[in-house]
Design a protein with these regions (language model features):
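Sequence-structural signature of the catalytic-core scaffold of metal-dependent phosphohydrolases
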Residues: 1-7, 14-243, 247, 251, ...
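Charged/polar positions within long, soluble alpha-helices
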Residues: 73, 156-159, 163, 351, ...
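Short, hydrophobic/amphipathic alpha-helical patches that form generic packing surfaces
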Residues: 94, 149, 153-160, 335-336, ...
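Short, charged/polar, low-complexity loop and linker segments
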Residues: 130-135, 326, 386-387, 453-460
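A glycine-rich, aromatic-flanked flexible loop/lid motif
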Residues: 238, 242, 300, 307-322, ...
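Zn2+-dependent metallopeptidase catalytic domains
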Residues: 351, 425-426, 484-491
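Substrate-recognition/cap regions that form aromatic- and gly/pro-loop-enriched pockets
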Residues: 355-443
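C-terminal amphipathic alpha-helical interaction region
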Residues: 454-482, 486
């Protein structure tokens, strides 16, 4: 089991396009817009009428998880693939749902996104039947998928948040304020719920029939609120822990600085006293004229001035050191708090996994592993912090706007160029520029297309578009940017 999870963890983001999740959105939105156009055609027919529903929705809802499965199965089937076991592939299938059946409003988490494309229908069926995750004709999540997803969420909500703090995307004060505000929102929501329950209770008491069953729903809701208050308590404990760490670490810094300052002053004074003693002994043992005595006084005065300046410089340096040291220790406190949170989140996940294992194994568990644990709110607040402080950061927003132009331009060029490639009349239909674009696409992707057998025209056209998606989604951010600049003469 650890080996399966380790492999799945290393591979789970392999399908992400350049610029991450925003890149996914750009690809899907581009196809939604283009497929609505009547002039987006193939042999004079609108392409939206050639493709079937699943093909269209695959293109309109590009998903990194589905792309990962495609890469690990289809695109390495040339005899040199990585030969993953079905248990690993099934663990990576986070959403065993096709593009015609998913909905973010679904209660069941497995249907929140599409998990595989039309092109992988057969392999997914084979995987699920082999591993036993097809139950009563329906695909369900592999049990280890829940752990993979939880590990991904914990890393995102802790390690990524820690990196963002280290880069200065938010201050400790901003984080604490945000965390407190989110807790207040949760508590206020509970107060509203209690008030609504009391309104209903008053109405029922007014029309009381004398049966306790009349109040069962309200009693049940009160029990849920009491349980949720426990969750809020544990969520608050995270903030208490962070504040305590910062308080202690900063106090230690201040104490250290005071000790250093006092020690320096003592050393300067001792040095000054020793100097005076030495000079006085000279006066007693030697015959000195008036000028010598004046010189000694001048030397003493210089020494006093230097000592005063040294103490002042030391104080100023200490203030700067204190500021830097304080920042370091605040980061250290935040880092320790994140480690503390991480352990609690892992504990919560393991509790839910073991407590719900029977329903997970039977394929009826519908939630993530934070559901109904003491840190259900904590993970949501941490994810919200990432959204607030990282994704809405100006530098990130500029990068995403740039990413939109880059990906859309590449799709415009390569998708339109590929329509008539490898057709009988491709010389007539393709422009010289179209042919050049096709030559840029990696040969291994074109070979994969050429050796595939298709049932009809729709499969051929769909597979060409998927080939371009494979090409673009396989780029790094920098490669996509450089290719865009080269194609558009931006140097």
């Amino acid at each position: 089991m650890p080996s399966i999870l380790a492999c799945a963890g290393l591979l789970h983001d392999i399908g992400n396009p350049p610029f991450g999740h925003f890149g996914e959105t750009v690809i899907g939105d581009w196809f939604k817009k283009e497929l609505e156009k009547d002039n987006f055609t193939f042999n004079k027919k609108p392409i939206k009428k050639i493709l079937n529903e699943q093909m269209r929705k695959d293109l309109e809802n590009f998903e990194g998880n589905a792309q990962a499965l495609r890469i690990l199965t289809k695109l390495h089937s040339n005899g040199n693939d990585i030969n993953l076991s079905y248990s690993i592939l099934n663990t990576l299938l986070k959403y065993p749902t096709d593009s015609t059946s998913f909905s973010r409003k679904e209660k069941n988490i497995k249907k929140h996104k599409l998990g595989y494309y039309y092109s992988e229908n057969d392999i997914v069926k084979d995987i699920c039947q082999t591993t036993g995750t097809e139950i009563k004709g329906e695909y369900v999540r592999h049990p280890l998928t829940f752990l993979l997803e939880a590990a991904d969420d914990i890393a995102y909500a802790t390690a990524d948040l820690e990196d963002a703090f280290k880069k200065g995307l938010f201050t400790i004060e901003q984080f604490i304020d945000y965390y407190q505000d989110e807790i207040s929102k949760i508590e206020n929501k509970k107060i509203d719920c209690i008030e609504q329950i009391f309104v209903r209770l008053k109405e029922k008491i007014k029309n009381n029939t004398g049966y306790i069953n009349d109040y069962k729903s309200e009693i049940s809701e009160f029990e849920k609120i009491i349980e949720d208050n426990r969750k809020i308590f544990f969520t608050k404990e995270i903030l208490v822990d962070l504040k305590e760490r910062i308080k202690n670490d900063v106090k230690n810094v201040e104490d250290d600085q005071k000790k250093k300052r006092y020690k320096k002053r003592y050393e300067d004074m001792k040095q000054f006293i020793d100097y005076c003693k030495n000079e006085i002994s000279k006066i007693k043992t030697e015959e000195n004229n008036k000028e010598d005595k004046i010189k000694i006084l001048d030397d003493l005065n210089t020494k006093i001035e230097n000592n005063a300046k040294n103490v002042e410089d030391d104080f100023n340096i200490s203030q700067e050191e204190k500021r830097m040291k304080t920042n370091e220790d605040i980061f250290s406190a935040f880092q320790k708090c994140i480690d503390f949170i991480k352990k609690w989140l892992m504990y919560a996940v393991l509790y839910r996994f073991y407590d719900s294992f029977d329903s997970i194994r039977e394929g009826v568990y519908k939630y993530d592993l934070f559901y109904d644990t003491f840190h259900e709110h904590t993970i949501k607040i941490l994810k919200g912090a990432m959204k607030k402080f990282v994704f809405n950061n100006n530098d990130i927003l500029k990068l995403e706007l740039s990413a939109k132009k880059i990906i859309e331009a590449l799709l415009n060029d390569f998708i339109y160029a590929v329509r008539y490639w490898n057709e009988d009349n491709d010389n007539e239909k393709m422009s010289k520029s179209d042919k050049k674009y096709i030559n840029i696409i990696s040969q291994s992707l074109k070979d994969e297309y050429i050796k595939t057998e298709f049932k009809d025209e729709s499969e051929k056209l769909y597979s060409k578009f998927m080939m371009v998606i494979d090409f673009i989604s396989g780029m790094t951010d920098s490669y996509a940017k450089n290719l865009y600049q080269e194609l558009y003469g931006i140097y």
